[in-house]
């Protein structure tokens, strides 16, 4: 099975490092090809790496995960977005759905959710 190229985005350094270090991404079918600490940095990494999947925090300073999704869609870069959120506010979920988010996951994330996600994403045409 080919590994899905993954970019991870979170503006909280501790959470970003935790996402990078805590999970065995390769065993779940992902190759982490980049990470970003802001929406602006995420755009640069996504443009450069052309990942299959972007795992992004929804609320970040300056540029939100939703804004990143919008910009990438405008540029017609083909990738799947998985949004992470600590907020149970339905408005965020509604906005993400309008932008065709692939998956919306509430923090904290657990391994079972990520394994399920990996299997689900593997069935998409990336």
Language-model segments: what does each one mean?
Residues 18, 22-26, 45:
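Alpha-helical interaction/dimerization surfaces of two-component signaling modules
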Residues 5-7, 34, 82:
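A structural signal for isolated positions on well-ordered beta-strands in alpha/beta enzyme cores
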Residues 43-126:
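CheY-like receiver
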Residues 1-2, 76:
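Short, flexible coil/linker segments at domain boundaries that flank nucleotide/cofactor-interacting
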Residues 27-32:
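A generic structural motif
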Residues 33-40:
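Conserved Asp/Asn-Gly motif in the active-site loop of CheY-like receiver
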Residues 3-15, 19-20:
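Conserved acidic segment of CheY-like receiver
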Residues 9-10, 36, 54:
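Conserved sequence signature across two-component system core domains
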């Amino acid at each position: 099975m080919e590994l899905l190229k993954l970019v991870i985005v979170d503006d909280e350094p501790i959470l970003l490092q935790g996402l990078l270090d805590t999970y065995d991404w390769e065993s779940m079918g992902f190759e982490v090809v980049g990470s970003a600490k802001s929406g602006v940095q995420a755009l640069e990494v996504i443009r450069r790496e052309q990942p299959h999947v972007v795992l992004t925090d929804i609320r970040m300073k300056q540029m939100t995960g939703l804004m990143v999704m919008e910009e990438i869609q405008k540029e017609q870069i083909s990738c799947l977005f998985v949004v992470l959120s600590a907020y149970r506010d339905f408005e965020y979920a509604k906005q993400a759905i309008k932008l065709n988010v692939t998956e919306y996951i509430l923090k904290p994330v657990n391994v079972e959710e990520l394994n399920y996600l990996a299997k689900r994403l593997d069935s998409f045409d990336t």
